[in-house]
Amino acid sequence: MEKIIIDHDRFLRTISRISHEIIEKHQTLDDLVIVGIKRRGAEIAELLQRRVEELSSINLPSMELDITFYRDDLTLVDQEDKMPVYSGSSQYLNIQDKTVILVDDVLFTGRTIRAAMDALTDFGRAAKIELVIFVDRGHRELPIRADYVGKNVPTSRDELVQVRTEKQDGCYEVAILGK
């Protein structure tokens, strides 16, 4: 069973709202960089970057972050001798003394974010890391909390939350899949 909880229009309104929140929280955007976790987090980061630029005329430096080898669940990912493929980060971005806006699609256990923070250290020591999550579904296993949340969606552990993006899925929407 599938239930659409965010449609295309609401998806883009959520991007706009989060962009406004980022701008409002910072007196200046000069030391901000935006980093999206591949794949859907990176596409959401790109949407946020474009919207922030539309609103402020400032183009935030950005990159896509591949956390493949920083994950602590590689043995779970490695099914039937299929090793995960590291595609690399889109570019090198020096984050030394910058405020990093880290973006991902769904916050669940917190393990992906922990892996992303580990991966970020390869790019310098950030002054601060702020977290943007499009959907927070709860069930944390690590003490991770988002600074900006598109939507809080209480779920059961059996349900799956899918954030669908144009490049990956051909549309912008969020669905819950369950029994």
Curated annotation (Swiss-Prot):
Catalytic activity: UMP + diphosphate = 5-phospho-alpha-D-ribose 1-diphosphate + uracil
Keyword Glycosyltransferase listed: yes
One Pfam family per UniProt: Pribosyltran
Motif (PRPP-binding): 100-112
Function: Regulates the transcription of the pyrimidine nucleotide (pyr) operon in response to exogenous pyrimidines. Also displays a weak uracil phosphoribosyltransferase activity which is not physiologically significant.
Membrane-spanning parts: none
Protein name per Swiss-Prot or TrEMBL: Bifunctional protein PyrR
Residues bound to substrate: R39, R40, D104, D105, V106, L107, F108, T109, G110, R111, T112, R137, V161
MF terms in GO: uracil phosphoribosyltransferase activity
Example GO BP: regulation of DNA-templated transcription
HAMAP family tied to this protein: PyrR
Origin organism lineage: Bacteria, Pseudomonadati, Pseudomonadota, Gammaproteobacteria, Pasteurellales
Entry similarity comment: Belongs to the purine/pyrimidine phosphoribosyltransferase family. PyrR subfamily.
